[in-house]
Amino acid sequence: MAPQFASSRATSLSVDRFSTASDRRHSSSSSTHQQRPQINERPITLWTHDPPNFSRNEVVLNPEYSLPRLAESDLLQLTLPAGSRLPHNSIPFGPKDRRCKFSTKATFVFRAAQATADADFVARQPQLQISVSKNIANNYGFYNRAEAILTRVTKDDFTIDHVELYFRDQYVGRAEMWRVFQNLEDTCVYCGQKVTLAGSVRATIGRIFIKEKKVTSGYVSASTKAIFRSESAKYNLFIQLSREMWEFDEDGEIYYEKALQGFIPELLRRWRAVPTNHILTVILFARVHYDESEIHMLEGPIRQDARGKYYIDYYKVVVDLESNCNWDAVMTTLKEEFFRFQHDILLIRRPISGPAASHEELHADLIRDRVHMAGRISSSYEGNLLEAINLALNPFDEHYIDRDLNRTGLSMVFLTAGTGHFDVDKKLLRITTERMIENGTGLDLVCLTKMPLHSVPLFHFKSHYPDPSELKQSQAAAHNRSQRRTGPGAGPGMTVHRPGQPALLSRHSSSRLAAVNSTPANPPDPLYFDSRKPVEEEDDFYSMPHWIDCSFYNLQQDKPFRADRFVPRCKMYDVQMMGFMENQISDIAIPYLDLKPVNKASSLHSSFYLPRHVGPSSSGFHSEPRNSEVSDLALVGLSPKQQRRIARERFDADVFRNVSPYLKPNPYRLLNAAAGTSGFIDSPVTSDMHRPGLRRNPSSGYGGIPTTNANSAASSISPGKAGASRPPVQQTRLSKLGREASLREDEADQDASAPPSPEKPRFNVLDEPLARPPLARPISHIVTSTTKPKSRAGSIRSVNTFSRGFMPMEPIGKAMAIVASTDALLSATSHTFDEQELDAAAAKQYNEADDSVSSLRSPAQLKAKGYSWLWKTLTGSTSSRSASSERSGDFDGGQGAKDFSTPATRSMQEVLSAQLRQQAGGSSKPTSPARRPPIPGRMSRTSSLLSVHEASSPAPIKIPAQQTPRSRQELETEAKLLRDQEAYEQQLEEEEARQRYAQRAQVEKQTLVNPSNPSKNLKGAATQLLRWQHLFPRRLNHHAVKWRSMTTPACLPLTTLYLPTESDLAAMWSEHPHTTSISAETASFLLKKSSSTHPALAVLREMAYHRLAQGYQFIVPASKQTRAVSSRKLVDPKHFTLRWPSELLQPGNLATGNPIFLSVTNQIHRISYDRSTSAINVKRYVRNTNYSTDPIDYECCIWPRHLPGYQTVKARFVYPDSASYNWTYLDSLIAGYVDEKFVESLRYWRTRFVLVPSEGSPPPMRAPTGEDLNDEEIRLIGTDKLAELFHRARFVRSKEEREQTHVQRFLPTSLDPAMSLQDDDFMKQLAEENAKQRAQSASSKKRLNKTISGRALEAVSRDMRSGGLVINDRIWHRMLYSDTFTGADMVSWMCIEYTDVRSREEAVDWGIRLMQDGLFEHVHKSHGFLDGHYFYRLKSEYAGTRGPKGWFRGTDSQRGSFAEKESLSRPLVHSSGQYAGSNTGETRGVSGGEVVSEKNAVAVAGTTSTSSRSSAGRHSRSSSLHLAHPPSLTMSSSHTAGGGGGKKKKKVQLSRSLVIDVDPGRRSDRAEVAFLHHDIAHNPANGFNFQIHWLSTSARFIEDAVQSWTRTLERYGLRLIEAPIGQIKDVSLHNPFQAPVQIELSLPPPSPATYRSKLPRGTLPELWFEYALLRRFGFVLDQEASARYPKDVEITYSSRPNTFEFSQFVHRSGVAFVQVLGGLDGFLWLNNRLYNSHTHALSQRHQHRDPRHAQQQQQQQQQGVVEAAEADKLRLELTRFCSDRDELERFYRRVLAQLLQVEKEESERDELAKEYARGIFQQAAGEDELSRRQAKSRQGSNSSSGTSADRPGALYALSQLSTGSERKSDA
């Protein structure tokens, strides 16, 4: 096939621009050009290969077959010709979890540099043209030897905008995410591609988007946004059991059935399809409201909301942190819970008098005489959603503690039967918003209903409007608090730039805006404002939190979705519940819609439809009935055509008279405010607050708002019937009968002389008031009078809403229900006029005023062509007077409204006169202090009107009977003067109105939202969305269920766009700068040295990585398409250029000086490098806080898993404290100015591990000398191996430093931690160990002068005695060995002492030679020289002389343990009741003085193993066995407990800390280091603790290191268990949904006084039986209670908590922890969630890595190992045993009997020790006699195995309690 040439236009034939395939196809083949065309496409033969067999690269291209003039940076596209692709169904797709839906047009894009990198492969296959991996071929339908088309494409067309990466079974930090993305930059990726980062992070490429379209491959540039999704997250599923959950949906399905049979199964199906490995928690929650009469029956945490309702919140945990739960059982439990939930929380059991009921009767499900139903489950709207969110966030506040290395992310899904609208507390909403945004956590809200017509999610709360004086005070207070902890400020002006600020809506809001001149430019968000005037009534606001993703799951099985199907949205539950035949015969009571009446303040029809010469009518002011004569007065003088037109318009207007004209959005409403219309922005109250003479109305529901009566009766008359006032909202839900009764009441108030009139229909053409539009009418009538009592104000209750954007703060939506105040306006008219005077004056006044006002126009009006009539109508001051009049009633709604009626004798002239006076007397808003005084007589003329407003008498005010009418000239003169003053005041206010508009319109846009018409350019919401904006590759479909978010939750994006302006930073943020100097010698353990990286660049990268790890985001440049307020608009190019971080972090770009910006909710960090000073400058901007950040205390009832019922839980919700992080110290630590030491304030990620003896026997092992080792010896070797692993992992800066240090071994001991501190020998060893570490450098210098080769034995012995080798008396299992040293110490000493000993292996060889030469010997002569805890001593000829040892110092101080008298399969138990080793039947010999042999039974399975080998007779050869006791144990237990007195406590450090390198293979480009804290002492029978703390190290390296240690230790019979750091008693403080299970004892243990004398002296008698019981079930000591330590010693641990209230045990399998309470309280049980959650993931991973792991796991199961799934079985078994009194009694008796045997054996051993010490026997004879007596005392116990003649029987006091045979007999 010949190459094809692309013929294109002349403008596209240059080398720099290549034509694509589509251009070639659409171009004309006949076009020509003088230049030679560029070849951009050619056919090519495609091969496939399987990496890494032929090549490690996925694409290999032969350059000879590529396109000409191909550059390495070019992009190539590989496609198959049409018709040659394999069928889609036959394409063997890859893994199901990343299957990509490739179409037939899918193309594969790759870089030329990627394809031509493997030259060796091309050289071996010269005929190769192009080859792709089989994975690519399968995904794209390619096949071997296929003919393909290779095309050159441009980067612009294939640059990826968003790419998704999926990962599972690993914890991926944000720093690792950024590094993964950096590795992908400047490469091409495809869907399904596997991505790795230095072998640590493994991810899979998911969806790829280019220009919001999904593609299969593309090019990753610096502007590409990466989306990281986790398939193994901590998943919380909350199900709200509100009242609606038991209701029926329209399709007849109950909502909880829809959840159980629809949503949850679908979610599980999608989980399995991925597949995911989430750790799941399922919680049911509800709120129950109680009446006040029911409070006395409740005992729970009763709370009261803002409305005074009493309630209790309930939570029940169904699934608790399970990774592989049985979903069949879970679904069954959920179904049962829906039936039992109400029963559990609504039925209250109460005691009654009479005899006690039987046990069965008390546990009956329903006892009519003993239970009472109380409370009602709340609706979803009133539920406890925010409380549940905060309870779930409490564990996440300390997410860095107990870090799960296999989980990433937190996902919360809330399932509700509501519509997404919730009534919440303001402070709780604020703290929830801050915590959600600070933690970078999202939430999915799934509603089972249809989507409502308003925006969701929607939170309704109450708040005060900011007061100007309070704003200034809060600003000052914020600056004073700038040095302290600062939260997300709501300072003035910060409403625009608050990321995380919800969009808000207010009703009744205009009255809360204070004077403009004293208010800051941008008042704070009401959500972030706390008023200091709590007496004021709060307004209603709405918030749309953008941290909630709302979905609607409303699938109907019988009605599949169709786009053309009508879906009803208004739910009428009574109608839905009707039967089919009930529609015509059933009555339904539907409340009336609360609408705002059409009055003169808001009427548009009265002005839109009237001609200019038509004056205002009085028809809106007289009461009903009215006669035709009065009705036709307004039509006098008009032509019949005009009369008919007005009549039609009256009718139309009457139809819509109840509907506010603001219901429809008006884009010019904003312009009206600029021209003087106040509306919500230009509130009359704002102006009137500055007006002298105004006084506050004390009876108003809104305490600080002047009560006004606007428009007199015109604005107060109820719609529908002009004479019938509308009652308050609480009284408006009347039937027709109620309305008629109200009408009759109105008629009764009329004058008796009024002629009767029939009832008028509702829609009468004569009902419409032809009044002058109120737009030009002044509002000076608001001025109140204090001379007369006021009438009752009208009532107002509304659900008013306000538009954002189109109508700033104007009432829309549901209108107000207004009830007029009595006597309005009637008394204002003191004169009567004739009709002609009224008509002329009214028309003239209307035209003049309207013209004067409409002439004041905004420049924006000029652009609105075709709307001049609308502008002219709306340019007056309507809105202000409308708002004023609408708010003139009683806001409490508690006062009734007296209906207003007009006396029948009132004439039309009087009514129109009143209207004219009202219009002329109060049109302007005098807010300026320099105001022209009112015209004389103006106030007097309107005094009657003003007095009406303040009148308190409910009776109508009578008009004076004798009043002389004034002349027409006087009337016109007065009207002209009033109009002149009106126009003058209007002009004065215009400038002020425009200024107000500029700020308040902006505020309204940014803080208020209309749920029914939300704005798309809300800045407050945009700044919050910017934190998550890069997570959305394209516009979301609000109708679709967000399954991807609920299946694979996304992590917080790494980049954001939000950056405040310079002025905002100066005004609303506090600055905290610091500088870090950089030099060429900069060195830190957090920096990896590299010759190619400048030190400043390395420090800068680490600073950025550590901030990313703490939740910060890079601030990146915004694209031109970004509409929101972003960094593109806020960066000043004069100072710097905001660039992509990946560009700035590259070599060569550091010297530009451009800063890197990183931000979190309340902080912004600006990091830049100053080349002139060689310093990195950091500026931290912390947002000021103007609101209270006090924590919120909360109480509720929670039913944790495995507990019998609800428990009262107290929780505290705390604001995030990101400002307290010590960034200055961290930056100094990165730069190397601070030593590497652990600092708690840096919030290290941390995890704890416990090393315990495993349940099975370790694999058989032989010493290098050939002898077999017993279980304890093997485990001691394992602990030494762990010390060696720690030594190898330590961080060293040089090779010499690594060679000079020696392995620091642990101090083995057979005592418990508390008892070891009373052992002088142990304390001496501890001091020597610390001294050895300090003197290590000095020993290294001495080493240079000595060699062991050719050195005489005498010289070596002198070196041993004086050269640093520890030779002293040692205790093991309560037996003293004098003048001994261990093999491990000997090896370490030789490595340090002699220069020719370079390794421990060489030291072992030299030790064997020295032992063979007779320098030293084993204490029992049973072992050769071994590197471990084996006791040796110099032979007598080399031992030298030592002073008296004081053998009698411990003769009577301590007794040994007792011998077990039963089977050999009993575990070894020491003086405190503990045993060492594992369950093996073999007899254990000495491991250098360890006179130990034991046999542990499997705790749960109860199996018994027999001994297969014997070490009998080892101790009979011992030559120097001294039975003595440590001097520190001479005091009694009472002494121990009371020691210390007033003495100063001695500090003892029982742990060691070091820095380890978890990347020994140097795979990472960073310094992967961590802090390791481990115990110093180790008892093989107890748990050994160590913790790992790290900052921004890749967690995968830490996990790999721990897993490597685990596999190594398993060969020595040891198990490494991941454990929680704190004690299990306090787990509820960290996670409120978790609680330990209490296991009580049915029979208390014997009193310590009964067995104290029989215990070995120095042994604590407390909890002896509890310890023995736990060890019987396979538990080992993890942490000992702090109270058991000596009082005169202050212990310090860095490897474990310093304080434990109760002793804590861990099971050998690692599945559970138990704390000992003591007495009848028994124990606390808690499953080990950390260990159990890893079982499934680790087993899958290790089976994949090493097939031997599966075989080993199978062997452990055959040996009876307890798996994680059996934790509950073990708990139930322990519970059964503790609840059986007979079993406990038998157990106690056996323990007491063994104590008697202990006392007998101890007396024999003490006597023998005394005789030997006195020198009665010779050494050999004494040893033989001792061996003989020991063998005799154990003959009974040896009968079962015959292998324990060498064991001191006193060491096995309670071993018989753990045998498998006894466990079976007990069962």
Curated annotation (Swiss-Prot):
Listed InterPro entries: DEP_dom, DEPDC5_CTD, IML1, IML1_N, WH-like_DNA-bd_sf, WH_DNA-bd_sf
GO MF annotation terms: GTPase activator activity
Chief site of localization: membrane
DEP domain residues: 1361-1436
Lineage, uppermost ranks: Eukaryota, Fungi, Dikarya, Basidiomycota, Ustilaginomycotina
Record membrane topology: Peripheral membrane protein
Localization: Vacuole membrane
Native species: Mycosarcoma maydis
Protein's name according to its UniProt entry: Vacuolar membrane-associated protein IML1
Compositional bias of kind Low complexity: 503-515, 705-719, 1501-1511, 1518-1529, 1750-1759, 1833-1844
CDD domains assigned to the protein according to its UniProt record, in alphabetical order: DEP_DEPDC5-like
Family that this chain belongs to: Belongs to the IML1 family.
Keywords on record: Membrane, Vacuole
UniProt feature, compositional bias: Polar residues: 1-14, 902-927, 1471-1482
SMART domains listed in its UniProt record: DEP
Name of one Pfam family that matches: DEP
Keyword Membrane among record annotations: yes
Region (Disordered): 1-48, 469-532, 681-765, 878-969, 1459-1488, 1500-1551, 1736-1761, 1819-1867
GO cellular component terms, semicolon-separated: GATOR1 complex; vacuolar membrane
One record GO biological process: positive regulation of autophagy
Entry annotated with the keyword Membrane: yes
